[in-house]
Swiss-Prot record:
It comes from the Bacteria. Keywords: Ribonucleoprotein, Ribosomal protein, RNA-binding, rRNA-binding. Belongs to the universal ribosomal protein uL3 family. The keyword Ribosomal protein applies. Pfam families: Ribosomal_L3. It comes from Latilactobacillus sakei subsp. sakei (strain 23K). The lineage of its organism: Bacteria, Bacillati, Bacillota, Bacilli, Lactobacillales. Coiled coil: none annotated. One of its GO terms (biological process) is translation. HAMAP family: Ribosomal_uL3_B. GO terms for molecular function: rRNA binding; structural constituent of ribosome. One of its GO terms (cellular component) is cytosolic large ribosomal subunit. This is Large ribosomal subunit protein uL3.
Length: 210
C-alpha cells in the first residue's frame, strides 16, 4: 500500500450538511502547498521516503545549510519539515508541490498532532480516578490511593500526578468530507488532536477498513 500525506494547520471545527440533510461535525485543516525538499532512496539513504516542507519562514531565521537544502527545490526556508515513507517515489521530484487535492472526498486518513497541554494535574483530572470520601472526618479527598505496605517500591506504570497533555497522538480512520484547492482547505469528519492553529500531519490510513 502506497502512502500519501500532507502537512497542515488545524483551524477549528464546524459542521456541514449532506444532500440528505445529515449533519456532520468536521475539522477544518488549512494545508498550503507542501514542497518536496528531498527524495530519499535505498542507494543514497538506506530507506525510501520523501522529505516535505510546509509553511515559509523568514530567511534570517535559517542557517546556510538549511538555505542551501531548500534552494535545490527552488523554494524558501520552511518552518516544518517531515518525512513520508511507503510512497510511490516515481510520483515525486525535488520541488514538486503537494496540494490538498492529493486526497479526495471519501478517503480514509490518519491525523497526527500534539495534544493540548494542561500542565501539572492530579490523578482525578489526568487519569479519571475516583475521589475519596468527601464527608467531615475523611483524611483524604483527591489524593492518590495507597500503593501498598510491603513491596517497598513504586511499581512501574503506577498512575501518579504529573504533566497532562502535550503528547503526540494519532486519530485513525477519519473520513475526508471534502477538499477545496482554491482555499487550500481539507474538511475531515470528527475531531483531531491539538489546539487551534497547531500543526497536524494527514496520511493515508494504515488500518482502513476495506
Amino acid at each position: 500500500m502506497t502512502t500519501k500525506g500532507i502537512l497542515g494547520r488545524k483551524v477549528g471545527m464546524t459542521q456541514v450538511f449532506t444532500e440528505n440533510g445529515e449533519l456532520i461535525p468536521v475539522t477544518v485543516i488549512a494545508a498550503t502547498p507542501n514542497v518536496v525538499l528531498q527524495v530519499k532512496t535505498n542507494e543514497t539513504d538506506g530507506y525510501e521516503a520523501i522529505q516535505v516542507g510546509f509553511e515559509d519562514k523568514r530567511e534570517v531565521l535559517s542557517n546556510k545549510p538549511a538555505k542551501g537544502h531548500v534552494a535545490k527545490a527552488n523554494t524558501t526556508p520552511k518552518r516544518f519539515i517531515r518525512e513520508f515513507r511507503d510512497v510511490a517515489l516515481g510520483d515525486y521530484e525535488v520541488g514538486t508541490e503537494i496540494k490538498v487535492d492529493t486526497f479526495a472526498a471519501g478517503d480514509v486518513v490518519d491525523v497526527t498532532g500534539v495534544t493540548k497541554g494542561h500542565g501539572f494535574q492530579g490523578n482525578i483530572k489526568k487519569d479519571g480516578q475516583s475521589r475519596g470520601p468527601m464527608g467531615h472526618g475523611s483524611r483524604y479527598h483527591r489524593r492518590p490511593g495507597s500503593m501498598g505496605a510491603v513491596i517497598n517500591r513504586v511499581f512501574k506504570g503506577k498512575l501518579l500526578p504529573g504533566r497532562m497533555g502535550n503528547n503526540q497522538r494519532t486519530v485513525q480512520n477519519l473520513v475526508v468530507v471534502s477538499t477545496d484547492v482554491e482555499k487550500n482547505v481539507i474538511l475531515v469528519k470528527g475531531n483531531v488532536p491539538g489546539a487551534k492553529n497547531s500543526m497536524v500531519t494527514i496520511k493515508t490510513a494504515v488500518k482502513a477498513h476495506k
